[in-house]
Amino acid sequence: MFTLRELPFAKDSMGDFLSPVAFDFHHGKHHQTYVNNLNNLIKGTDFEKSSLFDILTKSSGGVFNNAAQIYNHDFYWDCLSPKATALSDELKGALEKDFGSLEKFKEDFIKSATTLFGSGWNWAAYNLDTQKIEIIQTSNAQTPVTDKKVPLLVVDVWEHAYYIDHKNARPVYLEKFYGHINWHFVSQCYEWAKKEGLGSVDYYINELVHKKA
C-alpha cells in the first residue's frame, strides 16, 4: 500500500506563488485522494505488491490514472523551490543547444503550458532516441514515461493547482512558477536521464519517493 509523501518544503515558503491553503487542498486533499484511490483499486489484485513504477508502466484505466497522478504530483513538488536555484552548466548548454537560448526555452515552455486545453501537465523531457530535450503537453493523468521519455521538469495545469491563489489567471501562475523552479533537481534529472535512461525514473519513484520495506 502507498502513502502520501510529505512535501519537500514548508507550505508557507512560496510567497505569493502558492499559499498554505492551496497546498492544504492540492497536496492534502487532491494528492491524498489519488493515493487512497490507488490503494483501493489494487487491493486484492496482481498490482497490490507491485512498485509504483511497475504499476505506472503496466496498468491502464483507473489504476493507471491514479498511479500516474501520484507520480506526477510527487515530481511536481520536487520541481518547486522556495528560492531561485541555479541550473547546471550541462543543462544550460543542452537547453541553449535545443532551444537557441534559455529565454527561448522559457518562452516556449510557458506558451505550451498556457495553451494546453483543459486539465493536464506541461513537461520538459529527455527524448532517449533523439537525445534532445522536448517540451510536451499531456492531458489529464498522462505522463511522458509511457512514451519512454524521461521527465526533467513539470508544471501542473489542472485548475486545482492554481485556482485558489490565481483564479483563472493561468499565465500569472505560470510566470510565478518559473521563478520557483528547483533547477538543482531538474539538473540532476537531466544528468540521471543521460546516464540511466528510464532506469532513472524507476530509481526516483521506487528508491527516493515510494521505497517499500
UniProtKB/Swiss-Prot annotation:
Catalyzed reactions: 2 superoxide + 2 H(+) = H2O2 + O2
A matching Pfam family: Sod_Fe_N
Positions annotated to bind Fe cation: 26, 73, 156, 160
Record bears the keyword Metal-binding: yes
Residue intervals passing through the bilayer: none
Keywords (A to Z) from UniProt: Iron, Metal-binding, Oxidoreductase
Cofactor(s) the protein needs: Fe cation
InterPro entries: Mn/Fe_SOD (IPR001189), Mn/Fe_SOD_BS (IPR019833), Mn/Fe_SOD_C (IPR019832), Mn/Fe_SOD_N (IPR019831), Mn/Fe_SOD_N_sf (IPR036324), SOD_C_sf (IPR036314)
Described purpose of this protein according to its UniProt entry: Destroys superoxide anion radicals which are normally produced within the cells and which are toxic to biological systems.
Subunit structure: Homodimer.
The protein's name: Superoxide dismutase [Fe]
The species this protein was found in: Helicobacter pylori (strain ATCC 700392 / 26695)
Organismal lineage: Bacteria, Pseudomonadati, Campylobacterota, Epsilonproteobacteria, Campylobacterales
